[in-house]
Regions:
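N-terminal assembly/interaction segments in proteins that build large macromolecular machines
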Residues: 1-233
Length: 233
C-alpha cells in the first residue's frame, strides 16, 4: 500500500488575494491528488485561508495552518500540501496586480514602477499592468530582462546550437554570427520585455512599455513578477 505522504499531489488550486488598499498581494499554490477534491468548497476555503495568512505576513503558513491542514487531509483522504507562496508589498510609486488563469491552474503577480503618482492612477498605466499579467500567464517568461539571464544558461543555448547538424563544417565566423540570432531568439522566449506582445504579436512588450511611457510622460519599470503553474517546477 502506498503511504499517504508519498502520493503525488499535482492537482489543486492557485489562489491570490489583494489587501483592501491594493498595496499587498499574496499568492499560494495548494496541491491535492485529484481534481475532484480540488473543486470542493472545503478545499477552496482552505486555500483561501492559507492565502489570507500569507497576506497578513505569516512567514510559515504550514506551521500556522497545521490543525486546519490535518482536518482537510482527514476530510478528503488525500495528501494536501501547501506547495509554495509569495507575498508582494508595493515599494515606491506604481502598482502591483495579480491574475488567475484557467480557474486556478496559473497565477501571476507583477510589480510595475513609475515616477509620478498620477501615472500610477492613470487608466493607461492600469491597462499596461493588467496586460502584463495576461502576458506573463500566457507566455511564461522566466526573467524580466536579458540582464537577469545567467551566463551559463546563454552558454548552454550556444552549445546546443554549435553541436547541431546545421553548423557542421561551417566557418567559425558564420557560426558566431548565427549564434547571436539564436541568443536573441532565446531572449525573446524567456525575457518578458523581449517577448512578442500577446495582444499584438507584431509588437514586443518593450514597444508597449514605451508607448505607455509616451502616453504618460513618465519612466516605467517592470520591477518583478512571479508565475505559478499548477504542479510545475
Amino acid at each position: 500500500q502506498v503511504k499517504r505522504a508519498d502520493k503525488e499531489s499535482k492537482e489543486g488550486i492557485i489562489k491570490a488575494i489583494a489587501s483592501d488598499d491594493g498595496k499587498t498581494i499574496a499568492m499560494t499554490e495548494v496541491n491535492t491528488e485529484t481534481d475532484f477534491v480540488a473543486k470542493t468548497d472545503n478545499f477552496k476555503k482552505f486555500a483561501e485561508a492559507v492565502t489570507r495568512q500569507v497576506l497578513a505576513g505569516v512567514e510559515d503558513p504550514v506551521a500556522a495552518m497545521k490543525d486546519e491542514l490535518m482536518t482537510i487531509v482527514s476530510q478528503t483522504g488525500e495528501n494536501v500540501k501547501i506547495r509554495r507562496t509569495c507575498r508582494y508589498v508595493l515599494s515606491g510609486t506604481g502598482q502591483i496586480a495579480f491574475y488567475i488563469h484557467m480557474g486556478g491552474k496559473v497565477g501571476v503577480v507583477v510589480e510595475v514602477g513609475c515616477g509620478k503618482e498620477e501615472t500610477a492612477h492613470s487608466p493607461a498605466f492600469g491597462e499596461l499592468v493588467h496586460d502584463l499579467t495576461l502576458q506573463i500567464a500566457a507566455a511564461a517568461p522566466r526573467y524580466v530582462t536579458s540582464d537577469e539571464v545567467p551566463a551559463d544558461a546563454i552558454e548552454t543555448e550556444k552549445e546546443i546550437a554549435r553541436n547541431s547538424d546545421r553548423f557542421k563544417g561551417k566557418p567559425d565566423n558564420i557560426v558566431e554570427n548565427a549564434l547571436k540570432g539564436i541568443v536573441n531568439k532565446f531572449f525573446s522566449d524567456v525575457c518578458l520585455v523581449n517577448q512578442p506582445f500577446v495582444k499584438e504579436p507584431k509588437q514586443t512588450v518593450t514597444d508597449v512599455l514605451k508607448a505607455c511611457e509616451k502616453a504618460t510622460g513618465d519612466k516605467i519599470t517592470i520591477k518583478r513578477f512571479t508565475r505559478f503553474q499548477l504542479g510545475a517546477a
